[in-house]
Design a protein with these regions (language model features):
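Class I (Rossmann-like) S-adenosyl-L-methionine-dependent methyltransferase catalytic domain
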Residues: 1-69, 75-86, 90-122, 145-146, ...
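A short acidic, Gly/Pro-enriched loop at the edge of an enzyme's catalytic core
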Residues: 123-133
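A short SAM/SAH-binding and catalytic strip from SAM-dependent methyltransferases
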Residues: 132-146
Length: 227
């Protein structure tokens, strides 16, 4: 894997977390009120996770019986709300600083565990151990297609058959990026998104927002979800 890119990602996100983690996680404002910051995460979960609960649960299972994975959890902005929905939530992030703050922000939640990742794998997480995976405003910052592909393959590995991975990528066109730009990541067209699904083992079930910053992808791991 691209060591230079991964090292730059970790270094940059540690620096951003030290400077102003809340702003770099959700840059609507530089002066977040703590309550409003986490409220913004609740709104994102309500808008981008709850509408899929029928297909996540398969119409039979309770979300309290499910294990969810958040790739790029940051300081736990959305993790807190996810933990109110699912029985267990694992958050992964490349930044030690972000994970440290996330641990403080979720210390009251016994069904959350947080893992410092290497930026491209989910090392230490068991095969077929999760029922749902989610990522928002994370992959849009990754400058390397190969790193994103590695993450998708790892999510495929840790999901149970039939499970959903919903995530957002940069879909804007005409942007100039380079391999060490950890803010403006690589962009995806619908064709490239389909290639990503196929190369990581998933089926591309749905997509929305092509050509915009918020290009959402619904990747399904083939198989039947079991109760």
């Amino acid at each position: 894997m691209e060591t230079k890119v991964l090292n730059k990602m970790r270094s940059d996100w540690n620096d951003r977390a030290k400077e102003n983690a809340q702003y770099y996680v959700q840059n609507a404002t530089k002066e977040w009120d703590q309550r409003e910051f986490f409220r913004s995460g609740e709104i994102n979960v309500a808008n981008d996770v709850l509408p899929d609960m029928g297909t996540i649960c398969g119409g039979q299972r309770s979300p309290l019986d499910l294990r969810a994975l958040e790739v790029g959890c940051g300081v736990g902005r959305m993790t807190r709300m996810l933990a109110r929905i699912f029985g267990h939530v694992t958050g992964v992030d490349i930044s030690e600083e972000m994970i440290g703050q996330a641990k403080r922000n979720t210390a009251d939640l016994p069904n959350v565990d947080l893992v410092l990742g290497d930026g491209c794998t989910l090392a230490g997480l068991a095969d077929s151990g999760y029922d749902y995976a989610f990522s928002f405003i994370v992959f849009q910052h990754i400058p390397s297609y190969e790193v994103i592909l590695s993450y998708c393959r790892e999510v495929f590995r840790v999901l149970r058959p039939g499970s959903l991975f919903k995530f957002q990528v940069q879909g804007g066109t005409g942007m100039q990026t380079n391999e060490l730009d950890t803010w403006l990541g690589c962009s995806f067209s619908p064709e490239r998104a389909l290639e990503l699904a196929r190369n990581s083992g998933f089926e591309l079930e749905h997509q929305a927002g092509a050509g915009t910053q918020y290009f959402w992808l619904w990747f399904r791991k083939p198989g039947i979800a079991t109760p």
